[in-house]
Amino acid sequence: SKDSVEIIRRLPNGSTHSKKISLGENFRINFEEEFFNGEVVEVSVAPYAKINRSSEKTISGSGGIFTQPSSWAYLGPAFSYDGENYDKRSFSEIEEVEFRTSTSGGWISMIQHYFLTSLLPNQSSNSLLQGKKNKNDGSFSVGFVEETKKVAPGTSIKNEYSAYSGPKIKGNLDLMHPKLGLAIDYGFLYWIGQPIFWVMNLINQAISSWGWSIVLVTVLIKIFLWPLSYVAYKNMGKMRQLQPKLKELQERYGDDRQAMSREMMALYSKEKVNPALGCLPMLLQMPFFLAFYWVLIETVELRHAPFMFWIVDLSVRDPLFILPLLNMGAMYLMQLLQPQPAGVDPMQARIFKFMPIIFGVLFAFFPAGLVLYLSLIHISEPTRLER
């Protein structure tokens, strides 16, 4: 057929080795091999396959080495075998020590940003998985060698295995192997990242917009964190009410910081206020921010996904820097409304005032989808602080 090709190798001793390569759906490739023993003695054969590539990482798109998603995404081999569902081994690791392990089933992959190529040996056979550096050209290879099979004279043996070469779409990977979807690596916060993507994907299936999916997931995260955030916002309100009394203590004790601190702590205890709770909303958001970042740089579905007007790709920076400016303005407004704890060092206070600018410049080169999430978080904060 037009989607398959067969290669036949005829050996001088009368043996033949044929391989049929067929293109399946969802970037699947099927391999069917047959070996006929034309000799007069029994022979042993071991099916094998491997993937070669260099260790060079190409960074493309807008941004630099620190903010371009492809610069942070993992590039290198990964394996799945008995006792280990997902094992990343960097090029430097397998250069130092060749990787070898025996398993039944499993898979091997070469992973890069958004894409991967995987080999899946015959899942009913025992195989040796390998990863090493090739001395002849400096490239790296990962492969498998299945268990040796004996072929009697005048008989043949068949074997099948498969491969995947395409984008890291979880649905496709799960169809290939139950554990291949782990190649979409959300880092150590995968237990947050995976549910975030699941909800985003569910919303996108309903409304066909990844941008609005980010907006709605942000709202859901805010609702989820609201009980704890409410405690912090209520505490901030009490802190604002205490500002006149705190200023009075500052004027009364002047340079006697020890006495002033003692009286402030007594006042906080009396009024049941905890100044440290002012950091709680930011601390609660931190793991979700990091998980969101990894979801955005790992999710191929967001590649070239537009949102509104000028945002043509949520996976790269905002080309007009409008979202970073909105984020900067929201951070500055939140800073104005949030009460500053009494007794703060003047130098620290001045540095704190520049934080919106520092973070605004930093996030200007991060993916637009991430800055959209941050902007929504920061825009919602001043409203709550006012209440």
Language-model regions: role of each:
Residues 185-244, 250, 280-284, 288:
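Core alpha-helical transmembrane segments of integral membrane proteins
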Residues 208-209, 362-371:
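Transmembrane helix interruption/hinge and helix-loop junction motifs
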Residues 216-220, 224, 284, 322, ...:
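Lipid-exposed faces of alpha-helical membrane segments in multi-pass integral membrane proteins
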Residues 213, 265-293:
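Transmembrane alpha-helical segments and their cytosolic interface motifs
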